[in-house]
């Protein structure tokens, strides 16, 4: 199974890249974590934010392989505990499809992305910097995998 993290933004600080790659490399081959970066639209004083959001959404949806289970990371989504995320990960594996998780840009996700999603996950009620979300999601997915596989990484 492949977990595909599709995120808006391409020039991340080194600590974000290193943090994401640390958890990415921990996954076994049968549970690969892949990052797809979507260039953020140019934002300025007179930017057409609705158009930028739409274009980012189109690029995100185009990056999703046909048949993938789509999960958005969005405030109105479901708040999962770590065991609930582990359960969701287990269900995704049993479903037999790869999973695409979508992280929007500063204004969030395009309506088309939200409509295409089968599930929505609220990572936190806090507003988190989008670069940090990549690392937190990678760690959370690895922790969920470790629970499902009785790996000692997660401790109760």
From Swiss-Prot:
Domain of life: Bacteria
Primary enzyme class: transferase
SUPFAM superfamilies tied to this protein: alpha/beta knot
GO molecular function: rRNA (pseudouridine-N3-)-methyltransferase activity
NCBIfam families for this protein: PRK00103.1-1, PRK00103.1-4, tRNA_RlmH_YbeA
InterPro entries documented for this protein: Alpha/beta_knot_MTases (IPR029028), RlmH-like (IPR003742), tRNA_m1G_MTases_N (IPR029026)
Catalytic activity: pseudouridine(1915) in 23S rRNA + S-adenosyl-L-methionine = N(3)-methylpseudouridine(1915) in 23S rRNA + S-adenosyl-L-homocysteine + H(+)
Family statement: Belongs to the RNA methyltransferase RlmH family.
Name assigned to this protein: Ribosomal RNA large subunit methyltransferase H
Pfam families: SPOUT_MTase
Compartments in which it is found: Cytoplasm
Described purpose of this protein according to its UniProt entry: Specifically methylates the pseudouridine at position 1915 (m3Psi1915) in 23S rRNA.
Positions with a binding annotation for S-adenosyl-L-methionine: 73, 104, 123-128
Any GO CC annotation of this UniProt entry: cytoplasm
E.C. number(s) listed in UniProt: 2.1.1.177
Keywords: Cytoplasm, Methyltransferase, rRNA processing, S-adenosyl-L-methionine, Transferase
Description of how the protein assembles with itself and partners: Homodimer.
């Amino acid at each position: 199974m492949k977990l595909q993290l599709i995120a808006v933004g391409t020039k991340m600080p080194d600590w974000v890249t290193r943090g994401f790659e640390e958890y990415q490399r921990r996954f076994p081959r049968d549970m690969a974590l892949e990052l797809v970066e979507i260039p953020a639209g140019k934002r300025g004083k007179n930017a057409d934010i609705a158009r930028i959001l739409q274009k980012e959404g189109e690029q995100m949806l185009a990056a999703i392989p046909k048949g993938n289970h789509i999960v958005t990371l969005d405030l109105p989504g479901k708040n999962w505990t770590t065991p609930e995320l582990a359960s969701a990960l287990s269900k995704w594996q049993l479903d037999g499809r790869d999973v695409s998780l979508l992280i929007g840009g500063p204004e969030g996700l395009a309506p088309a992305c939200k409509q295409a999603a089968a599930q929505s996950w609220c990572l936190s009620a806090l507003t988190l910097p989008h670069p940090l979300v990549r690392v937190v999601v990678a760690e959370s997915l690895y922790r969920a995998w470790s629970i499902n596989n009785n790996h000692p990484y997660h401790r109760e």
